[in-house]
Amino acid sequence: DVLGSRGLGDVYKRQNWDWFSEKIRNAGRPVKVLNLFAYTGGATLAAAAAGATVTHVDASKGMVTWAKENAVSSGLKDAPIRWLVDDCVKFVEREIRRGNTYDAIIMDPPSYGRGPKGEIWKIEDMIHPLIRLCAKILSEDALFFLVNSYTTGLAPAVLTYMISTELKSWNGHVDSQEIGLPVTNSGLVLPCGASGRWESR
């Protein structure tokens, strides 16, 4: 059997939260973070607790409500967080038109999903175009760009290629890792996704 998949996923997420929280705290300036496919808000709250102003976007109204409740229970009710129920791709396209930029972008896209108006999301077809769009709203002195993918269809090397290609204008470094679950009876690791981190040098 597979050992607590959710537990290991949570451990991996917390490692990412610790990583970017330190970057936000050490930036020495105000940091604007965009969190796409933001679910129940773990990354949003970690970034806000570290001192960032956060825009939290998810297509599910129920998830955004849950995330707001998590903010209250975490003592972050009054933190500078903007809560939005929206299709992530359409939101980014509007931000490009508005000329808004962010110092850091986090995304945790599903393998498959639907936007609030029935928009279809398929990670294999849409992740690279979305990274390309996000590069257009990344500030000149960006801190980090984080993509988590819980699908085996996206290898770490592919994630590194996509992020490196779209963020080549920034002076930074990409590191991508496989996310895996330990299988108790064999000692092997079951691949379940990949995580790609870009950080400024």
Regions picked out by a protein language model, each given a short descriptive name:
Residues 62-104:
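S-adenosyl-L-methionine
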